[in-house]
């Protein structure tokens, strides 16, 4: 029989008592009063901060947005179907943040930076706050490097610089996303990291964009953040900030980034839904009073950093959808006033077969011209003016029957210039090709061709110059100027190609 020794037992108990460390962990808790429509009202949580993450008993996370005298309004980051009235909630003491790393490149993630492409976890050692203050005045420098979109109409007349914010605005189905994805495709080999944020879109549309990027090898330098139409409003509202945090991570590491928000109208609608459910007072078009701040704090994060901070940049291309061309609605006017210019896409031009359907007359870039390369300035200087005069003449010519020869010539030139601005989707052009195309049009080399022959001739001319006059591209890319030598080479190439082309057409 085992003898029980009392002194041994008392020694063990004494040791355990001495080892006992009385740690008091204070947790700020509350109780669910009501829950529904993605909103929970909570009693308690006295010490909670605005924007703090709270955790429900069954694991759902929420953000405390409304701090009222007797309860806290929390928006849920999930469906919250298992949350019950009376269950407990605890404050986490953290503000929303996401992991960030190089490993995110080529992946499709959601607003919480969790992968949704079925390719496993993403390793990350660092994290960033989803909402962080924008760089101040001293931290920035003015925009001076071009960000080429590969679209002639934009790069020649509405140029975008690295660190600029340029709005893409237009009705539904006018090619807004196409302009944005073409810009991503054109960054291949330019050492620019792209972030595409899809907010409240159809999952099929997002899949189509991802497929296009994968086929063209553009996913290598792209991150897609997607919250589709069936996602909770909270996540649709957060997605752009998640994208911005990822782009900022690269920007502060001396890299160039491009971020596309597709589109901010849907984010504003998600925010309106949250605000109304939280019983915040509605303002114009039932949007809450701080919807301007919603977008301004997001877009101000795009910047060109100073040399002390490593000259990284973040260029933002927000997209806004208008209803039947109404640019004076609330969200469009807000975003126009925040950004450094806008590209206006018109449904009428799109339906008339002019694609990309950019309305050059009312599209502007407020800072990009400082970023244009000299060669482009030299050839594209008079393009915008000629097109504006042509549009005016065309409207007048509809009513006048007999036009003098000069007017007829100007109309013919305008039609050909409009033709050279047309481009197929996913076929961006290099700067050298754009310069060649514009020079051919503005100097009258296309005037003798039929309108239907213009695009075919230009395609063949680009191929001809690439194979027979490689020096042309070398001069432009090395000197960034349209030198006399380059002009002589181009004139020669145009003449030779024109003779070949006309012989082919006759044959």
UniProtKB/Swiss-Prot annotation:
Domain of life: Eukaryota
Listed CDD domains: ATP-synt_F1_alpha_C, ATP-synt_F1_alpha_N, F1-ATPase_alpha_CD
Binding site for ATP: 170-177
Location in the cell: Plastid, Chloroplast thylakoid membrane
GO CC annotations, alphabetized: chloroplast thylakoid membrane; proton-transporting ATP synthase complex
Site (Required for activity): residue numbering on this chain: 363
Subunit structure: F-type ATPases have 2 components, CF(1) - the catalytic core - and CF(0) - the membrane proton channel. CF(1) has five subunits: alpha(3), beta(3), gamma(1), delta(1), epsilon(1). CF(0) has four main subunits: a, b, b' and c.
Protein name, UniProt field: ATP synthase subunit alpha, chloroplastic
Gene coding for it: atpA
């Amino acid at each position: 029989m085992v003898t029980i020794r009392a002194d041994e037992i008392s020694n063990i108990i004494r040791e355990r008592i001495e080892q006992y460390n009385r740690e008091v962990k204070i947790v700020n808790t509350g109780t669910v009063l009501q829950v529904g429509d993605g909103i929970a009202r909570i009693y308690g949580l006295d010490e909670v901060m605005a924007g703090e993450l709270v955790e429900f008993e069954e694991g759902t996370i929420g953000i405390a947005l409304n701090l009222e005298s007797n309860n806290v309004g929390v928006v849920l980051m999930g469906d919250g179907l298992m949350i019950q009235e009376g269950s407990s909630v605890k404050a986490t003491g953290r503000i929303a943040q996401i992991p960030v790393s190089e490993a995110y490149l080529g992946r499709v993630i959601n607003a919480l930076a969790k992968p949704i492409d079925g390719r496993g976890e993403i390793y990350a050692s660092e994290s960033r706050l989803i909402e962080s203050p924008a760089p101040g005045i001293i931290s920035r420098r003015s925009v001076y490097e071009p960000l080429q979109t590969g679209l002639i109409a934009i790069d020649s007349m509405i140029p975008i610089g690295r660190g600029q914010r340029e709005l893409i605005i237009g009705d539904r189905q006018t090619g807004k996303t196409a302009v944005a994805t073409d810009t991503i495709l054109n960054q291949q080999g330019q050492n620019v990291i792209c972030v595409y944020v899809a907010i409240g879109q159809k999952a099929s549309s997002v899949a189509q964009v991802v497929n296009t990027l994968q086929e063209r090898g553009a996913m290598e330098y792209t991150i897609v953040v997607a919250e589709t139409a069936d996602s909770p409003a909270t996540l649709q509202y957060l997605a752009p900030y998640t994208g911005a945090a990822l782009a900022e991570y690269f920007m502060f590491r001396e890299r160039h980034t491009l971020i596309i928000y597709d589109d901010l109208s849907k984010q504003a609608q998600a925010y309106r839904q949250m605000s109304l459910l939280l019983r915040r007072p509605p303002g114009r078009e039932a949007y809450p009073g701080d919807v301007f701040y919603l977008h301004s704090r997001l877009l101000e994060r795009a910047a060109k950093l100073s040399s002390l901070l490593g000259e990284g940049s973040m260029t933002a291309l927000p997209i806004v959808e208008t209803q039947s061309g109404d640019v004076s609605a609330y969200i469009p006017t807000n975003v126009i006033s925040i950004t450094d210019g806008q590209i206006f896409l018109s449904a009428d031009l799109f339906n008339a077969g002019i694609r990309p359907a950019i309305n050059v007359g009312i599209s502007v870039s407020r800072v990009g011209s400082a970023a244009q390369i000299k060669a482009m300035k030299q050839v594209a200087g008079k393009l915008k003016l000629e097109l504006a005069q042509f549009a005016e003449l065309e409207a007048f010519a509809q009513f006048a029957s007999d036009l003098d020869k000069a007017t007829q010539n100007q109309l013919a030139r305008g039609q050909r210039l409009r033709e050279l601005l047309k481009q197929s989707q996913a076929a961006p052009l290099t700067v050298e090709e754009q310069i060649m195309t514009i020079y051919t049009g503005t100097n009258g080399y296309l005037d003798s061709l039929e309108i239907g022959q213009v695009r075919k001739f230009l395609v063949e001319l680009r191929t001809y110059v690439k194979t027979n006059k490689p020096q042309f591209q070398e001069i432009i890319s090395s000197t960034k100027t349209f030198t006399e030598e380059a002009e002589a080479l181009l004139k020669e190439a145009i003449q030779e190609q024109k003779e070949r082309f006309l012989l082919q057409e006759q044959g």
